[in-house]
From Swiss-Prot:
Catalytic activity: 4-phospho-D-erythronate + NAD(+) = (R)-3-hydroxy-2-oxo-4-phosphooxybutanoate + NADH + H(+)
Complex formation: Homodimer.
EC number: 1.1.1.290
UniProt key word NAD: yes
One Pfam family this sequence matches: 2-Hacid_dh
SUPFAM superfamilies: Formate/glycerate dehydrogenase catalytic domain-like, NAD(P)-binding Rossmann-fold domains
Pathway as given in its UniProt record: Cofactor biosynthesis; pyridoxine 5'-phosphate biosynthesis; pyridoxine 5'-phosphate from D-erythrose 4-phosphate: step 2/5
Source species: Aeromonas salmonicida (strain A449)
Descriptive protein name: Erythronate-4-phosphate dehydrogenase
Originating gene: pdxB
GO cellular component: cytosol
Keywords annotated in UniProt: Cytoplasm, NAD, Oxidoreductase, Pyridoxine biosynthesis
GO MF terms, alphabetically ordered: 4-phosphoerythronate dehydrogenase activity; NAD binding; protein dimerization activity
Function comment: Catalyzes the oxidation of erythronate-4-phosphate to 3-hydroxy-2-oxo-4-phosphonooxybutanoate.
Length: 377
């Protein structure tokens, strides 16, 4: 069996070698000729799986993406060809949640904000959006959930208060986007934040995009940011990746190269979920578990000496992941050719909050809800 994988997919060799020959290739440069003898194709979001890529792949019998989103895959084509398709829903939801939490704490310190007194709207309340919402609620924030497809289902079940509409959500102090990219239909998300919506936003409103770059109109944002009443932007994703609108970067609070979901656990979990799926597809028992893939964290345990407040939460979160390091690296290298993908390929080791065990009398439920492993007493 020949297994073609994105070369940046972690642990692919050790997980899939038991099935046959593993052939790692650059994700953005995969071509049809690479798949002529392939039985399995494993990709990330940078590879478009379409008729052109699959033009000469008669042996292909399994396609998987180690990502939450699937907009880069022509699922209808795979269905017509009877090729099973698997994704990794929720694989990096904790990583993205940690990213948003880290950015909120940076902005709170920078602009002297009390997050408990603020509201946050999550646009897209799926696996990732709900993780962000739960962390925000743990901070004491008022959280609004906007998800039209889920709202319709909830409405049919008589649950009318679980979701708000888009306009209501846009009224929150902070609006965080966690939607797939769709261009058609009543719930299309392409340029969901368009020129008109951008123009109507109050000065200083915090907007976060850790979903897909095309969800925001980047040119319209640049025009707004160059005016007298700019917004506070947190951008992990960009239109035109891997060539973002460089002129927009200086006008952001936090700017990073699509790495919100890049924790060690998140990346390993995505590959491992595909490993499980292939085992199931072939009728084989999984021989490896997720934890065996992960190294011991640098910081394993800590005992706070004070009650939990926003300052302590910031210290603990940034001990594990401080988004400012990624922001500084991105800004320093933005002008270098190919730096966007290079930073993703060689992203430094980063753990999720769950890797830190918080012990002692101040190991509260709040810290557990934020994602830390808590051992009170």
């Amino acid at each position: 069996m020949k297994i073609v994988v994105d070369e940046n997919m972690p642990h692919a060799l050790e997980l899939f070698a038991e099935f046959g020959e593993v052939i790692p290739l650059p994700g953005r440069q995969m071509q049809a000729v690479d798949l002529q003898d392939a039985d399995v194709l494993l990709v990330r979001s940078v590879t478009r799986v379409d008729a052109e890529l699959l033009a000469t792949s008669p042996r292909l019998r399994f396609v998987g993406t180690a990502t939450i989103g699937t907009d880069h895959v022509d699922k209808a084509l795979l269905a017509v060809r009877n090729i099973p398709f698997f994704s990794a829903p929720g694989c990096n939801k904790y990583s993205v949640g940690d990213y948003v939490l880290s950015t909120l704490l940076v902005l709170a310190e920078r602009h002297e904000l009390n997050l408990r007194e603020m509201s946050l709207a999550v646009i897209g309340a799926g696996n990732t959006g709900e993780c962000v919402a739960c962390k925000a609620e743990a901070l004491g924030m008022r959280v609004l959930r906007c998800d039209p497809p889920r709202a319709r289902v909830a409405g049919q079940a008589g649950e009318t208060d679980a979701f708000v509409d888009y306009q209501t959500a846009l009224g929150a102090d902070i609006v965080s986007f966690h939607v797939p990219i769709t261009r058609e239909g009543p719930d299309a998300t392409f340029h969901l934040l368009d020129e008109q919506v951008i123009a109507a936003r109050p000065a200083g409103q915090i907007l976060v995009n850790a979903s897909r770059g095309e969800v925001w109109d980047n040119q319209a944002l640049l025009a707004r940011q160059q005016g007298l009443e700019p917004l506070r932007l947190v951008m992990d994703v960009w239109e035109g990746e891997p060539e973002p609108l460089r002129a927009l970067v200086p006008h952001t609070e936090i700017a990073t190269p699509h790495i919100a979901g890049y924790s060690l656990e998140g990346k390993a979990r995505g590959t491992w979920m595909l490993y499980q799926a292939l085992c199931q597809q072939l009728g084989r028992a999984a021989r490896q578990d997720l934890q065996s893939l992960l190294p011991a964290p640098e910081v394993r345990a800590l005992t706070p000496g004070q009650p939990v407040d926003q300052a302590l939460i910031k210290q603990l979160v940034h001990l594990i992941y401080d988004v400012r390091r990624d922001d500084a690296r991105f800004r320093n290298r933005i002008e270098l050719p190919g730096s966007f993908d290079e930073q993703r390929k060689h992203y430094p080791e980063r753990r999720e909050l769950s890797s830190l065990h918080v012990n002692g009398p101040f190991a509260s439920d709040t810290l557990a809800r934020l994602g830390f492993t808590v051992q009170p007493g």
